[in-house]
Amino acid sequence: MRKQSTTILTLPDFSKTPSIDQVGVEERVARFQTRSIKKESKVQGLKLALNMIDLTTLEGKDTEGKVKQLCYKAAHLHDVMQGIPTVAAVCVYPTFVKLAKRCLEGTNIKVASVATAFPSGQSTRKVKISDTHFAVDNGADEVDMVISRGEFLEGNYSYVFDEIAAVKQACGTARLKVILETGELSTLDNVRRASEIAIYAGADFIKTSTGKISPAATQPVTLVMLETIRDYYYKTGKMVGMKPAGGISTAKIALQYLVMLRETLGDKWLSNEWYRFGASSLANDILMQLQKEQDGVYQSGDYFSKD
């Protein structure tokens, strides 16, 4: 059931958003990529990354059968290997939320739903709010919305802020992840500004991408977003989550993202309450790497289910 929020949101002066030193960002990312992870820490990191995944299917050809299969996989990873955690959530279109909730009943796996005319965001606010209400009323624990990139790029920051705040209110008790679609924002300065708008408007998480355009998540963009979260935390004491999504398909890259997370935000963010990976194939590679660490042998990719 939806509950009305009484939070009063105020709009800071986003013209004072600091400029980003792109060279400095790239240098910091390069340092994270050189970190060596020893075996015991690697296994711990792989399990943590697995527990942070939003296992996702967001295709026009999605069917009830595919969603059921995805939910089964999410709930039965331990059938493949003992002692591993579940994923954090399954992410689907609003029309499949009720089905996913039914399939995952009795587990601690959340159901996330995209909304607000995903992935383009090209619709009226009324339609976006209705889309959000539909997802929440059908049981979505989390909502992944998209910002209006056209309005943002035209400098209509108040419009973007107000829309996010309205969707946040429509979410009630469901957590809100705000997708910036960083591949369409062109500059790191824009990524920083969009991150600030989303955070101040009430985002529980900020998220890089829909996964529908290229580039999707990149490490420089993710670092800028993490640093925005850090600066907001220093100023307010409030934690905001982060979700890189799209293009993260290997365990090696996921571990690099976790190193970046820990060294930028600290251990408090090292849980799926505050960090997620949006992915469809990452889980399989993590399972393969865990099997290798356990048995010393790589399984064929076909050993693990694809969906």
Feature annotation, model-predicted:
Residues M1-L50:
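Charged, compositionally biased N-terminal leader segments and the immediate start
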Residues E40-L48, K61-P85, T95-K243, S249-S280, ...:
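Alpha/beta enzyme core
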Residues L58:
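A short, histidine- and acid-enriched strand-loop-helix "catalytic/donor-clamping" loop
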Residues D285:
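N-terminal beta-loop-helix "entrance" segment that forms/cooperates
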